[in-house]
Swiss-Prot record:
Keywords: Methyltransferase, Nucleus, RNA-binding, rRNA processing, S-adenosyl-L-methionine, Transferase. It is found in: Nucleus; Nucleus, Nucleolus. This is Ribosomal RNA small subunit methyltransferase. The keyword Nucleotidyltransferase does not apply. Its EC number is 2.1.1.-. Changing residue 66 to E: In dim1A; loss of adenine methylation, but no effect on pre-rRNA processing. N6-adenine methyltransferase which modifies the AA dinucleotide at the plant nuclear 18S rRNA nucleotides A1785 and A1786. Required for generating appropriate patterns of gene expression during root development, including the cell-specific expression of transcriptional regulators involved in root hair and non-hair cells patterning. It comes from the Eukaryota. Expressed in rapidly dividing tissues, including root meristems and lateral root primordia, developing cotyledons and leaves, petals, anther, pollen grains and silique abscission zone. Belongs to the class I-like SAM-binding methyltransferase superfamily. rRNA adenine N(6)-methyltransferase family. GO terms for biological process: cell division; cell fate specification.
Amino acid sequence: MAGGKIRKEKPKASNRAPSNHYQGGISFHKSKGQHILKNPLLVDSIVQKAGIKSTDVILEIGPGTGNLTKKLLEAGKEVIAVELDSRMVLELQRRFQGTPFSNRLKVIQGDVLKTELPRFDICVANIPYQISSPLTFKLLFHPTSFRCAVIMYQREFAMRLVAQPGDNLYCRLSVNTQLYARVSHLLKVGKNNFRPPPKVDSSVVRIEPRRPGPQVNKKEWDGFLRVCFIRKNKTLGSIFKQKSVLSMLEKNFKTLQAVLASLQNNGEPALNTTSMDLGDQSMGMEDDDNEMDDDDMEMDEGEGDGGETSEFKEKVMNVLKEGGFEEKRSSKLSQQEFLYLLSLFNKSGIHFT
């Protein structure tokens, strides 16, 4: 109108959600570790690096609203998606209902750590980072073999998985994981690739279980590594002089000797002591980040009131000297060196569970 103000109209916002990111009006909870992949190029890269075959059954853990699920369905034969959040389950079902993918998608609602997993060829997972360790070992100990797992982890956890002897992040988790699998770092993922963005960067790691698996008693191996990594930068000689360590080992030693003596008196055949389980003193294979730095605790070297004897202490030290391990540090030892040292202890009747 003449003499009046011209009002500029604001462009109308589109009601259509971006085609690359399926939102569905769901709010995501950071407290539950819900961070949905929103970068389609990253989704494509993960699928490509997984090496999926058209005949593969794919286990997807934490599918969210299905951005990655769609690409997995396009690449493989079937997707079995395990999702805890009932809202996400409904969103997945709604998204693929009436599409060519609907009969190739099976959704299981539940906690993946408590769910009996079916047979699968490949696992692809974008998980809450708080379940990283227990989920990793659940997969590694899965009763049926699978080709690989491609998993999104918090970056520091991922770098601990792939760390090598001498690396700052080399730890019990590194040795444990690499005993059971070949592990490789695939991608570094910035926090802005997620909705909502997490506080830390992430990494995608490929895990390929070793077949056949290692011939080692899991509890014995884990108990042994827990001792070795009490303080990974101290010498093994210092670690194995600790009263608490000597007391535990001597208790196991005496228990084993009593069992063997009882069997001998009853005329029963000798046991394979390298595979014996003398009681569950370990806490499982999960990484609990209990390794200590040099200033975290004082050493409790020498004899104490725990029942350990100077003779047994000498026996333990002789094992370390025999293998040339007394002055070595866990932070520098390879997997094969750990296996060799454990075999020397077992050969001397010394056990860690």
